[in-house]
From Swiss-Prot:
InterPro entries: NADH_UbQ_OxRdtase_su1/FPO, NADH_UbQ_OxRdtase_su1_CS. This is NADH-quinone oxidoreductase subunit H 1. It comes from Nitrosococcus oceani (strain ATCC 19707 / BCRC 17464 / JCM 30415 / NCIMB 11848 / C-107). Belongs to the complex I subunit 1 family. NDH-1 shuttles electrons from NADH, via FMN and iron-sulfur (Fe-S) centers, to quinones in the respiratory chain. The immediate electron acceptor for the enzyme in this species is believed to be ubiquinone. Couples the redox reaction to proton translocation (for every two electrons transferred, four hydrogen ions are translocated across the cytoplasmic membrane), and thus conserves the redox energy in a proton gradient. This subunit may bind ubiquinone. Its EC number is 7.1.1.-. The gene is nuoH1. It catalyses: a quinone + NADH + 5 H(+)(in) = a quinol + NAD(+) + 4 H(+)(out). PROSITE patterns: COMPLEX1_ND1_1, COMPLEX1_ND1_2. The chain crosses the membrane at residues 8-28, 74-94, 107-127, 147-167, 179-199, 230-250, 258-278, 297-317. Signal peptide: none annotated. One of its GO terms (molecular function) is oxidoreductase activity, acting on NAD(P)H, quinone or similar compound as acceptor. Keywords: Cell inner membrane, Cell membrane, Membrane, NAD, Quinone, Translocase, Transmembrane, Transmembrane helix, Ubiquinone.
Length: 319
């Protein structure tokens, strides 16, 4: 009974924390973008505008729950929920500390890759069900982009698996006791970081929803809370990729003096802020440049990292 209560507390505690962080991240991003662009961010609702997110949520909840008459109603309604559920499920295998985490899977890394793949269905179904040419074009862009960069993401993680000898995320963190994998796996880290940005549809890789080209991409026809779910899903993806980078390459919760959860949060916050800085600093490339960049540069780098890591592991095992 106690084990069940502990598990439920973990699940709902982590779920509530993640949704709160996603909402807080929206406010932090808007404030930082305002600061970097020398303008005011949200500063009217609550102290420093921190309640602006609550005001936006109320606005979305009170909007008419409208479905276009030409849309496939059932698929149109279900699509936004898929991205949020898939992203939250991927968090289930993240070990925040030795004791805080939802489930300890031996195939945790594969589970993450499987859940991140499900997000593609949400985008494609949402674009297709809208029965709008801009939505469909955005959905097809997103499918090609996400499927392509998932290949590079998966290959970049195989070097970590070779060094740790496991797909279990807790054991991968434990394997970094002496040295974080960001040093021997620097190439893998670079590839994973760039692929993660593309998976989350963040600038400079937000081409599926490029406003100047496709109005709003795959969620052009969405409004109200259905649009809000896509919006929350994007920020949850930022949190997920940041948490994975910390876990796989920067020793997870490990660090001197401070409690494990504090160390995890410090590293995690750094990468979340890095995602926001990218939005402020980089332009959006053309779609053909994005795909060429992936297949002509990212794939060779991921394969090179795999070959070098395999050779080093084999040589060390031989000695």
């Amino acid at each position: 009974m106690n084990a069940t209560l502990t598990s439920l507390f973990n699940i709902f505690g982590i779920l509530g924390t993640l949704l709160t962080l996603a909402a807080l991240l929206i406010w932090i991003e808007r404030r930082l973008l305002g600061f970097w662009q020398e303008r005011y961010g949200p500063n009217r609702v609550g102290p420093f505008g921190i309640l602006q997110v609550v005001a936006d949520a109320i606005k979305l909840l009170t909007k008419e729950d409208w479905v276009p008459p030409f849309a496939d109603k059932l698929v149109f309604i279900l699509a936004p929920t898929v991205v949020v559920i898939a992203t939250l499920l991927a968090f289930a295998v993240i070990p925040f500390t030795p004791y805080i985490g939802i489930i300890d899977l031996n195939i945790g890394l594969l589970f993450f890759l499987a859940m991140s793949s499900l997000s593609v269905y949400s985008v494609v179904l949402g674009g297709w069900a809208s029965n709008n040419k801009y939505s469909l074009m955005g959905a097809l862009r997103a499918a090609a982009q996400m499927l392509s960069y998932e290949v590079f993401m998966g290959l970049s993680l195989m070097g970590v698996v070779m060094l740790a000898g496991t797909f279990n995320l807790r054991e991968i963190v434990a394997a970094q006791q002496d040295m974080w994998f960001c040093i021997p796996q620097f190439l893998g880290l670079v590839v994973f970081l760039i692929a993660g940005i593309a998976e989350a549809h963040r600038l400079p890789f937000d081409l599926p929803e490029a406003e100047t080209e496709l109005i709003a991409g795959f969620h052009t026809e969405y409004s109200g809370m259905k649009f809000g779910l896509f919006f929350v899903g994007e920020y949850l993806a930022i949190l997920l990729i940041s948490a994975l980078i910390v876990t796989l390459f920067f020793g997870g919760w490990q660090g001197p003096w401070l409690p494990p959860l504090v160390w995890f949060f410090i590293k995690f916050s750094f990468f979340v802020l890095f995602f926001i800085l990218l939005r402020a600093a980089l332009p959006r490339p053309r779609y053909d440049q994005l795909m060429a960049y992936g297949w002509k540069l990212m794939l060779p780098l991921a394969l090179l990292n795999l070959v070098i890591t395999g050779a080093v592991v084999l040589a060390l095992d031989g000695t």
